[in-house]
Structures are given as C-alpha cells and as structure tokens.
Amino acid sequence: MLTQLKTYPKLLKHYEEIKEAHMRDWFSKDKERASRYFVQLESLSLDYSKNRLNDTTLKLLFELANDCSLKEKIEAMFKGEKINTTEKRAVLHTALRSLNDTEILLDNMEVLKSVRSVLKRMRAFSDSVRSGKRLGYTNQVITDIVNIGIGGSDLGALMVCTALKRYGHPRLKMHFVSNVDGTQILDVLEKINPASTLFIVASKTFSTQETLTNALTARKWFVERSGDEKHIAKHFVAVSTNKEAVQQFGIDEHNMFEFWDFVGGRYSLWSAIGLSIMIYLGKKNFNALLKGAYLMDEHFRNAPFESNLPVLMGLIGVWYINFFQSKSHLIAPYDQYLRHFPKFIQQLDMESNGKRISKKGETIPYDTCPVVWGDMGINAQHAFFQLLHQGTHLIPIDFIASLDKKPNAKGHHEILFSNVLAQAQAFMKGKSYEEALGELLFKGLDKDEAKDLAHHRVFFGNRPSNILLLEKISPSNIGALVALYEHKVFVQGVIWDINSFDQWGVELGKELAVPILQELEGHKSNAYFDSSTKHLIELYKNYNQ
C-alpha cells in the first residue's frame, strides 16, 4: 500500500516543507524552470512547469515509483501476464496496436496473429463500404453508419470520429446510439434511409440490455421499411464474441468481428470496437491512429521516468491527490473537435481507478481516483473557471490544445491559443491584493472603495496545471494522446495498489434493476424493495395505467 512504502514519509515531510511555497516565486528565481519541466515526444509535448513541485519532489516521486516496482509492472502488462487479478485476465490493449513482430502467447493463443487477422477483415469490410462496393438491399451505397453500443463500445469511437472529422469520408454520416431512453435511437432513425444505412451493434456478449434494446428497435424499424428480414444481412454487422446470439438476431456470421477478454471496454477503441472509426476514417488513418498509440507505448515502456510522459502525469496526479488532498481533476481541451474527450477520460480514469480495495483485498486508507470532469476550455472560462480561480478547492487542470490553425478562420486560433496560455499563467501567478488595489486606484476609484473592492479582485494563484500540446489534431496524435492517458491511469493504479482493469462497481445497479423492471412491466417479483423504491415503483405504475 502507498502509506507503507518507504518513500511515503519522506514525501509527507517534503510536502510540509513546500506546501506554502508559491509557484510565481519559483518562476522568478529559476529562469530555466519552463525548459527543465518540459517533455516532447515527436509532435506531442507536455509543459508541467506550472505545478507545485521542484526537483526534490520529482526525485521522491520517482523513488516512490521504484518502491512499487513500476518498471517491472509495466513489463508485466506488455508481456501478457494476468495483472487483472480479480478476473484472472491479461491486459493487452497494447497488443492491438503493436508493430512488434515478437509474438505474445496467451493460453496457447497467438495474440498478435489473432489481432492482425481481425484487423485484416476490418480493413476489407471498411474498404467495401467506403468504395461503394458494399450496397444495401436496393443497391444503394451506404451513406449512414449507426454505431449502437454503450460505455466502452460507444465513447471511444464517438470521441475519435468527432476528433478526426476532418479526416472522415465525405459521403458518410456517423451516428452513435447509447442511451436506452428511446429518444436517442428514435431521433437517429428519423434522419436516415434504411436502404443506405449500416448498423454496427457492439456488444461483447450480445446481451447488454441497453445495446440490445436499441438494436432490436432498429431491427424492427428496418424490417418494417425494407419488408423482409433477409435484408438484415446487408445492413447489420456485429462486434461480439457470441456467434449464436448474433446469428439469431439475423446477422451473418461473416459480418461478426470478434475481440477478446484481454481487452477491457474502455481500452477497446483499437479493436473491432473501432470498426466505425475505420469505416469513417479509412484504413490508412486507422493505422496512423494505432501507430501513434504504439509510439506512446514504446515511450512508456522504455523512456526513463524523468522524461516519461505517462509516468510524470501519473505521479504528479498522485502528488495532489494523496498529499494536497485534491478531490477533483479537470480536463480542458481547447479544440472543438475534442469536445467528447473529457467524458471519454472520465470513464477511462474513474472506471479504472475509482476503487477502495487493494489487490490483496484490504480497505485502502487513502484517496484514489479523483472526480474527473471537464468541458471545452473556452466555454468553461465563461462557466466554472470562476470557482477554479477564486473558489476554495484545489483542482489541477490539464489544458489540451493544438498549434495548427484551422483553415478559413483567420485570427480565430490566435485568440483561442492566447486564452490557453493566459489561463494557465493566471492559475499559476494569480494577482495579489496590492496589485488589485493599485489597478483600481489607477482607474480613479475612491481610496476606501478601492480597498474594499480589491479583496474581491484577488487571485491567490498557485493553481496547478499541465499544458498538453499537439502540433495538430491528427490520427497519430490522437492515438498518442489516448495512450498517454491510458498509461497515466495504469501508473496511478500501481501506486495505489489497486486493479485498474476490472469494474465491479457497475454490477450491483444492473442486478437490482432486474426485479424492478419486472414490477414496472406488470409482473410480480419476490425481491425486497425499500420503502422509497417501492413507493416510486407504484408512482410509475399508477401514472402509466
């Protein structure tokens, strides 16, 4: 456990020594701070100079990582050891994008051979849709792709297709359906033509309640309009491992793309779950996405901790969570194409590390994953940045931006990028009472009024942030960015001694929903309901009589 590691008391002592130190003083005294706390991996860079740390902090954090045998645990993941201990599974999402030819054997399966076989089928299918060779039941080309999934079968593909819209096929419109409330699927069905739509049903077991409910609604709608169930074969494909259920649905087994237990849902966009990505972007751009992630994998595996991007981000996060007692972390992308990135990272981070039981089954006496949240940075400045600047919470921020200007939007990117730098500087530097008072007096305010108002215009500063810069929003850079966060999450899971690759927390609610659904559908259940739940069930039934 973290609190039992030999470096932990050293970090506690160091925290007491520097907790009141202000970053603006460090910048003032150290002219090389920005260049020393800056790491670049090809066209992705991290400026971590605006953090409440110094060389001693980093040295101790690296010692902490060594206490946990982080290097050895990184290797264990890449080699296919069953580090997902509660489910007795390997964790090999890295194999999905590996360019290495050294085979990984897992329970007598050749992992890379299996992965590349599925990728080959995905490429052939993608080419047939994009080229117009794959036609619908009336011989129309496919114009709309509807991805039906939830969680990891939805968020990754949605985020990547949105982020890389400039690389998408101009004929294809992408639609993503995850919510079971009925509104989302019906809204999509109103917009599309059954004769030119391809549905991708993404569910490993092909039994996920939300996904199957939406898929069956889409199936019914399609059959009513096409007039024959046999046409399903041309318009529905599955990403699943349950061949029997897929065939019962009406999907040709040749249109089923498999993935494996060694790939968790939130790590699966690189697998057949990314079929919608490949169709939209094409195999060349999908390969670039994989290559960017592989580049980050190799960096994570081989770079020394001092210049290792995921290690640095992971350890800095631990520094705030477990020593400054920070409870929250903000993701602030300054690019409209990255608008879904915060909620993708929400799932990746909180479903992985939102746990309180150690690998040995013991209750952990320290905080683990913070609440991860975020929004488009420029919009957030006019919404919740007030709390970040002058509120009572310490909330570290990841600013994410690109250097590349958007075509046909002269002056826009300069305004956007100036705000990234200004906000990061403001969070670091702040504004003192004396500075605020001087500004007000310079504007001609009465001295007594200025003294009162100046208190409200103070910015304490010392708010930490990272700045992640991409040269441009490209497939390879998005691949590297996602892999960076995947590995950051892994680093923190190792430090906290938790299993980052199960998600038992999603199970209880699903179990309890079964008897409640029986009651709502008019059937009697033998389950016990607390008085509140029972009252709300009756309220629903009475309203819908």
From Swiss-Prot:
Uppermost EC category: isomerase
GO biological process: one example: glucose 6-phosphate metabolic process
Keyword Repeat among record annotations: no
Keyword Cytoplasm: yes
Underlying gene: pgi
One CC-aspect GO term: cytosol
Organism: Helicobacter pylori (strain P12)
Protein name: Glucose-6-phosphate isomerase
Lineage: Bacteria, Pseudomonadati, Campylobacterota, Epsilonproteobacteria, Campylobacterales
Domain of life per record: Bacteria
Broad class of where this protein is predominantly found: cytoplasm
Pathway(s) the chain acts in: Carbohydrate biosynthesis; gluconeogenesis; Carbohydrate degradation; glycolysis; D-glyceraldehyde 3-phosphate and glycerone phosphate from D-glucose: step 2/4
Similarity remark: Belongs to the GPI family.
Role description: Catalyzes the reversible isomerization of glucose-6-phosphate to fructose-6-phosphate.
